């Protein structure tokens, strides 16, 4: 026991040192004066030791039986190739990981097992490895050799690189968050990070293969069309026209000229799935490039889609054609207030334009069995289905959260005008109006209080009372929190008949 005790203690010390801590042991070199990205600065050579076995099968045996003796660091494989036709200086972390059986000259590649990161030399290995591990190596004629492992810029994550180059006072909140729209990454850098925008943008561009361009929002949304001034901080700037996939649809648009928010995809999907039914008529008052209208049209919902922004209207038409929903979606370029007031008339005009008030929609051809293809002389006949356009509108979508509630007054009287005052004979439409309900930081506001505030704004805009539209008749869905004290809601309710 007196002989075994030091060995046991030594083995325990190694096990203890091998346990993975939450801190990654290999951080990139630091240069807080860097303003233009220098990738070569991050090449780091780490002295290690590897075990080389004459019999390759012993690699797995040693790795399994002596787990606490081998390198166990995330993102670094413990099995590496030990010989290469390239000089060590040219090795990169990517090449370290390519474990092929032969190099470019068909020379067999010898693989080895990297020892624990605390072992930096052959002398370290003989001093730190437990005796049973050393005995196994000796029995199998293994050789402990020095090995230089090379890490480079590609090895580290974006946050790790940025933490190595940004000033220390910014390390608590390294700006790595962004939204992706098509091939564009969109950042909203705070003022203190603006001097480092090109550095931040280039790192994000490098670390995300699908991104070709990184933009930063220069100021808050202030234009009439909810677009914002932006700066290209990395990547190509010749075209900001993107293609974005959402709800099994493809949307094409110029990201700098229209409003698009990728974070709203679940809200687009929610309304289309939960409320809009095939054959119903939906008016999308602030349609943008069609994230509500186009998926609804694919579902055989009949949509009147409107947007005031000429660029949005241009791409709305293009997306209608691109997604083959021209039969069920009509586009308009009007002010939202005018569109609401004229919507019953626009629907009646559509009905008149279609023969018999019906829309004929082509269906995909039925796939024929191979035997039918040989036997039938006639090609498959085109198939169609018909949708009767209803004479009433079932839903209005108003996704303009800054000001949509202020447009509600335009509903007053429009149905009476088209039904000769007999509004009790028609089914009043549902309105889905998006809004913000901001409150001061520090205020303790309950969800019920916020709901009551939104309800009060709605009935005030409609010029009705709480008896006409009770709070419990309004469904309030929290879409997202734009900021901790700025929730965005979608209020859904059926218009009161006395509107």
UniProtKB/Swiss-Prot annotation:
GO terms for molecular function: tRNA (guanine(37)-N1)-methyltransferase activity; tRNA methyltransferase activity. Keywords: Cytoplasm, Methyltransferase, Mitochondrion, Nucleus, S-adenosyl-L-methionine, Transferase, Transit peptide, tRNA processing. S-adenosyl-L-methionine binds at residues 268, 307-308, 335-336, 399. It holds the Pfam family TRM5-TYW2_MTfase. It is an enzyme of class 2 (transferase). Its main location: mitochondrion. Its EC number is 2.1.1.228. It is found in: Mitochondrion matrix; Nucleus; Cytoplasm. PANTHER family: TRNA (GUANINE(37)-N1)-METHYLTRANSFERASE, TRNA METHYLTRANSFERASE. Monomer. This is tRNA (guanine(37)-N(1))-methyltransferase. It comes from Saccharomyces cerevisiae (strain ATCC 204508 / S288c) (Baker's yeast). The gene is TRM5.
